[in-house]
Every structure is written in structure tokens, then in C-alpha cells.
From Swiss-Prot:
Any one cellular-component term (Gene Ontology): cytosol
Name of this protein: Phosphoribosylformylglycinamidine cyclo-ligase
Annotated signal sequence range: none
Family, as annotated: Belongs to the AIR synthase family.
Length: 343
């Protein structure tokens, strides 16, 4: 009996089925600048250089981390794709870039076209929210490489910003303020600690109703990462945004510090925003100290804008009108011993 690729663990027919299932969905993200059809070796995107005096391309890549373990355990796969897009576009947004297009990498031990399509549906939804086109991707079937029914994801975003409009935080000065925009929950960071606390220490079940959360645990943990593209572009021409920070791994201290000039520190008021119940649950079950919580999790703030003091009310009004919960969370001060002080 002769051996075949399928017997070795790679099912090309299933891959072809997958492509046929996702093609019409993916096309719904296409912008007018997309020049290619699905299935070519490369994606082509012709952005309008006339819109920019000196266009600069901006790129970013990221994954979803161990949040995927929650998707596996709950057998719910239609939101982690949103997380993937959010993690990438929110990063390139921090320098003022408009997301143009996105590519994904999906790898699994045995391809299940239906399940993989659910993941792509989430990526498509995320791309639509961010305004970028999904112009390509890679699907890798890797026998005996992953555990049964598991997969991994990576995403790649490319955007553009005019060179004179690049935002890097260098103009932040004493007296400027920090506007925090609410997260939807854990987003896509800290899940290794969250899972350890909730499942190993707390002995909670993925399908268990948690009164403090007013929902089952899986629903809370799989809330998609917020996408902040519309928030920035609502502010862009009305407020001078001097810096932006995407609050991911490392929390507020680890991420806000990345954009502050050497002589500037941030003084933040932890009582100025609402910390979602999931963080209190993790803190209480795990008996985790507050400093560690802020170091690992976003603690309810997913994105931070730095603006001048006289634009506080305008910024808050614009963001709230766009449907974002925004708070004045602190101010910039002259350099001290600690880069970030949360009190």
C-alpha cells in the first residue's frame, strides 16, 4: 500500500475546502486599493500616495497568547480572530498610523475547515472594525506538532502615516494629561496567570456561572480585545494627540513608560476609572498584590491618549460620543524616581 500526503497527516482537500469557505467572507474586507484576488502568491495593495506629503509605512505583528486555551476549552472560536487584529492594529495606531491591510497565520495539527472558518470570521470582523483589508494569510497543517483540537495564531498589520504626523511621545511635557479608554476586560494579556488563579487555585469551571461577573466564565474571558482605531481618528483633527499607549503585557506601568520622555513621569489616580469585576475576582482568589495586578493586567484601561490640559473636556466628549468609556486618569509631571506612579 502506497503512502500519501493525507495518510501522513496533511489533507489538501480539507485545505481547499477551507479556502472556498472563507473566500467570500474575506472579500468583504477589501478596500478599493486591493488589486488581487484570493489565491495568488502575494497580496497587492495600492494606497493613494497623493493623500500624504511623505508617507511612512508602519508594521506590527502579534498573537493572542494563551487566551487561545480558553477558546479550546469552551469550543468557541469566533472571537479570537478579533483579538488577533486588535493586538496588531492597536500597536501600529500608537504612532498615528491608519491600518491598511492585514495578514494572518493559522497553524494546527489537523485542519478542521469549519472550526478554522470561525476563526477567520473573527479576523474579518476585526479588520472591518479597524478599516483594513485582509489580503492574505497562511494556513499550516502540521501533523503531531500541536495537541488535538488546538491551533496557534499570528497576525501582521501594515499601516501608513505622514512623516510629520508621526506620534512618538517626544513632545509630552509637564502638565499634559492622560486620557484612559476602557478595556473590554482582560483583552489578550495575562491569561497564563488568570488561568492559574481561576482554574488551578479557584477550581472554577469554564462553563460556570459567576455571580460577580453576571455571566459564565467563558463569556467573560473570551470578550474580544477592544479596537481603538476609531477612537484615535475621531480625535485626530480636533485634538492635539501627543502620545498613545496600548496597554498590553506589562500593564499600564510597562507600556505607558515606553512613550514618556526621559524627564517626564506619569502620576495616575487609580480611583478615576472603573476596574472591571474580573480583575477583582482574580486578585481575590489568587491573593495577588495590587502592584502585581497592575504589572500583569490592563486593569480596565486598554488605551491611553496624552493630550494638553485645555483639551480634556473636548477629548472626553469626542470619545464618549463615539461609544468609548473615557476617563481623565492622571497628569504628566517632571521626572522623579519612578516613571509611573499609580496612587
Amino acid at each position: 500500500m502506497s503512502i500519501t500526503y493525507k495518510k501522513a497527516g496533511v489533507d489538501i482537500d480539507e485545505a481547499d475546502k477551507f479556502v472556498s469557505m472563507i473566500s467570500p467572507i474575506v472579500k468583504t474586507t477589501f478596500r478599493k486599493e486591493v488589486l488581487t484576488e484570493i489565491g495568488l502568491f502575494a497580496g497587492l495593495f495600492k494606497f493613494d500616495v497623493k493623500k500624504y506629503k511623505e508617507p511612512v509605512l508602519v508594521s506590527g505583528t502579534d498573537g493572542v497568547g494563551t487566551k487561545l486555551k480558553i477558546a479550546f476549552e469552551a469550543d468557541k472560536h469566533d472571537t479570537v480572530g478579533i483579538d488577533l487584529v486588535a493586538m496588531c492594529v492597536n500597536d501600529i495606531l500608537t504612532v498615528g498610523a491608519e491600518p491598511l491591510f492585514f495578514l494572518d497565520y493559522f497553524a494546527t495539527g489537523k485542519l478542521n475547515a469549519a472550526k478554522a472558518t470561525e476563526v477567520i470570521k473573527g479576523i474579518v470582523q476585526g479588520c472591518k472594525e479597524a478599516g483594513c483589508a485582509l489580503i492574505g494569510g497562511e494556513t499550516a497543517e502540521l501533523p503531531r506538532f500541536y495537541k488535538k483540537n488546538e491551533y496557534d495564531l499570528a497576525g501582521f498589520a501594515v499601516g501608513v502615516v505622514d512623516r510629520k504626523e508621526i506620534i512618538d511621545g517626544s513632545s509630552i511635557k509637564e502638565g499634559d494629561v492622560f486620557i484612559g479608554v476602557a478595556s473590554s476586560g482582560l483583552h489578550s494579556n495575562g491569561f497564563s496567570l488568570a488561568r492559574k488563579v481561576l482554574f488551578d487555585i479557584g477550581k472554577l469551571r469554564i462553563d460556570q456561572y459567576i455571580p460577580e461577573l453576571n455571566c459564565i466564565l467563558a463569556k467573560e474571558l473570551l470578550k474580544p480585545t477592544e479596537i481603538y482605531v476609531k477612537a484615535y481618528f475621531a480625535l485626530k483633527d480636533k485634538v492635539k494627540v501627543k502620545g498613545m499607549a496600548h496597554i498590553t503585557g506589562g500593564g499600564i506601568p510597562g507600556n505607558l513608560s515606553r512613550i514618556l520622555p526621559k524627564n517626564i513621569t506619569a502620576i495616575l489616580d487609580k480611583n478615576s476609572w472603573t476596574v472591571p469585576s474580573i480583575f477583582h475576582l482574580i486578585k481575590n482568589i489568587g491573593k495577588i498584590n495590587e502592584a502585581e495586578m497592575f504589572k500583569v493586567f490592563n486593569m480596565g484601561i486598554g488605551y491611553i491618549f496624552v493630550v494638553e490640559q485645555n483639551e480634556i473636556q473636548k477629548s472626553l466628549a469626542i470619545l464618549n460620543k463615539k461609544g468609548y468609556k473615557a476617563y481623565l486618569i492622571g497628569k504628566a509631571s517632571k521626572g522623579g524616581e519612578d516613571k509611573i506612579t499609580i496612587k
